[in-house]
Amino acid sequence: MPRKLWEANSKTKSKSNLFDFEKFLARKFNYKPKKNYKKLFNWTIKNPKLFWTSVWEFSNIKGVKNDKFHFPKEIIKSKFLVNSKLNYAENLLSISDNTKAVTFISESGYREEISWKELNNNTLKLIKFFEDNKIKENDRIAAYTANQIETVESFIATSAIGAIWSSCSPDFGTQGVIE
């Protein structure tokens, strides 16, 4: 087995989201938090239904949760929370304060940041633009654009209306874009 390069100390682990999730499991089930990834991993393998349902609840996912599961012998074919529905944009934009949401740094070092509030406002403007132009659920929006803040906003707005987003960055080069 390869040598471990780094491991967080106990204090850092105590402040982690993973440990918060373990404490959440402890409140709901007979699970004792140990700040031990392997123990948690083994619990998830033994309790996949409880795990996936707990991830949904712990993450405060907004949507319609269906507790239907399919666990065949071939783990790669497993399905969890089958037919559950959520909107990525609705969940992402539930934060609307002035804390940093997105940071863009170009190859040349140009840096730009926006807050959750700005991300929400800009995304709402794009949603209105899409609606005014009769773009609707299952329509496709394709972009040839750099991975910058406006691209993120466009993706979120597309998701919010149920359209399908596809983008390709110019740094793929002409052949990469064509393929």
Q: What spans do the regions from the language model cover?
A:
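Charged, compositionally biased N-terminal leader segments and the immediate start
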Residues: M1-L25
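AMP-dependent adenylate-forming
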Residues: R27-Y31, A89-S115
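Acyl-group handling in specialized metabolite and lipid biosynthesis
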Residues: K35-F41, I75-K85, I105-I114
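RNA-binding accessory domains that recognize and position tRNA/RNA substrates
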Residues: K38, I45, W56-E57
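Adenylate-forming
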Residues: T44, L93, L119, T123-L126, ...
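A short N-terminal helical cap/helix-turn-helix that marks the beginning
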Residues: T53-N66, V82-T103
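Conserved AMP-binding/adenylate-forming
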Residues: K79, F129-F172
